[in-house]
């Protein structure tokens, strides 16, 4: 009975016996494309009375990594025997820290990307075979269990010989290419793309769905101005040439490029207002978006996106998902993003061990795409269900390099050296490095997946580490930014706001680990972080420099900052920070919600009650004090909310009755607008608010009061947020 063959190499002394050389089909059988019995001379040549010429083996395309590793281990063992210090390729197993040393498991090899924050303690390395076990293909062939390792083969396992006939003989090795080819042929011809986009309605002529040449280049320019600087998932020098060629021959565009072009149309329109769309293209934004999104779906079907292993097809899917975000329920979009992430994992862009054959350009574009995709997914999960986020220490894709697109050429074998000054990658790099820190942090994992804390980087003092991270980012990138440059301005204030959000989350994590009520000093620390979040967001929303980037700013509504401030103001209405807090909220409210549309009504109803309760606490305290001074002047935000509530109260009765009949709102009456409410901030439905612009999901913010189970209580009524069918109400209002 055959025994399983392991692909792992855990020791330096065990070497597998050499496999017998494969006998290739003879030259004549290859030319005639018939089966050769691989004897010499073969039966076919004997029967044809011709000379049988044995084919020569093609040169191996891949370097024999296994032989190199074996020799390297031998040299390392010799150095160890002679007590010569050196840096080993892999840390010996004996040097590993046990789980009992620090209470957590070690991080797999390479599982931490190389970011700015180099002061973090990097855990020891486990054996290579354990980490790469997930990359093995388990196949039961001829009674033998074959463990095929993607990154450790004999240099020829991944490819067939060019002239092989494809038949498997007794002397053949079972290679990954053979297994994969057989598996692919099993499902050949089965198109399952309808599972994602539905069955096509008749024949769709995609060439007729493209805009005119002038509009193609206008959309491309909008993409370069508004979208590309923030996402950086396409390589402008090479893609622009292809788009110019494609525009000159619309009917002969490859399916992958066509899908990418339509996704660029879609995401470009996302960054424009309706007035800009009418001025540039003579049509309404909604009309254009609907048409291009439908065409993009058909183009993605044409390139078999669900089976594709092409990075550019995945980029097209990602841009399409970004474009539909404002009008899509976050829970639904999260499900679609899981498909995109699974495709990315099948390609292997999350795993550095799969990059061996990639050029420098392809490697960098994969890094950029993975980080952009994961950060987008994390934000969507904040709005729906944090526990499904993929921002975790379970993969090892490196942070993108701080290099310009023109520094990356297709023929380059090695990547260029990163710049020490801001480049066009500034926003994407800084955002990725901050996300790289967060994904290893306990304050993030405690809310998303606490079990992953066992493999996260151990930080002795996360508060101090956050300060060090901010200092590192400031010194390496932000100190050289020009605030008059739009991208630099966007990077400065986005990162400062994101750091404040991380500090607030870390503050909650600390307070939730103790049953002792927070002190006033601790409360004031949280207030400072929340104020910083609001002030940074207001800077982004009011500056004319960010006009083209406003589509992404809308995506990050600072709802946790509002809730934190209002919670505190309700309990401490006359603290020293009260006036500053009301002013900061009023400034942000003026640019965020002063002109709220009908679509925002569900969110506004809830938000208005939280605000009015906090201000009523201030007024009640003034009355109770019986001061002779004039009553406090309501902030601008309170005045506007009261006006809107009065307008809504006059017309809300009929709308509420209709909603109750349809099951949209449970137990909501017109009078509820004037009654205090109790909010369950752990309800995921709340994250849908802000009219599609994206309120932050509140599950990780459930300990806003940090004082126990009643932390989410902002009122005294029986009305719970999770009794409202937000999606049904939103659909009715639209």
From Swiss-Prot:
Coiled coil: none annotated. Its main location: nucleus. It comes from the Eukaryota. One of its GO terms (biological process) is DNA-templated transcription. GO terms for molecular function: DNA binding; DNA-binding transcription factor activity, RNA polymerase II-specific; zinc ion binding. Residues 86-122 are annotated as: Disordered. The keyword Cell division does not apply. InterPro entries: Sec_Metabolite_Reg, Transcription_factor_dom_fun, Zn2-C6_fun-type_DNA-bd_sf, Zn2Cys6_DnaBD. Residues 26-52 bind DNA. Keywords: DNA-binding, Metal-binding, Nucleus, Transcription, Transcription regulation, Zinc. The keyword Thylakoid does not apply. Secalonic acids show unprecedented anticancer activities against various human cancer cells and might be interesting for further derivatization, targeting diseases such as cancer. GO terms for cellular component: nucleus. It is found in: Nucleus. Residues 86-107 have a biased composition (Basic and acidic residues). Transcriptional regulator; part of the gene cluster that mediates the biosynthesis of the tetrahydroxanthone dimer secalonic acid D. PANTHER family: UNCHARACTERIZED TRANSCRIPTIONAL REGULATORY PROTEIN (PTHR31001), ZN(II)2CYS6 TRANSCRIPTION FACTOR (EUROFUNG) (PTHR31001:SF45). This is Transcriptional regulator AacuB. It comes from Aspergillus aculeatus (strain ATCC 16872 / CBS 172.66 / WB 5094). The gene is AacuB.
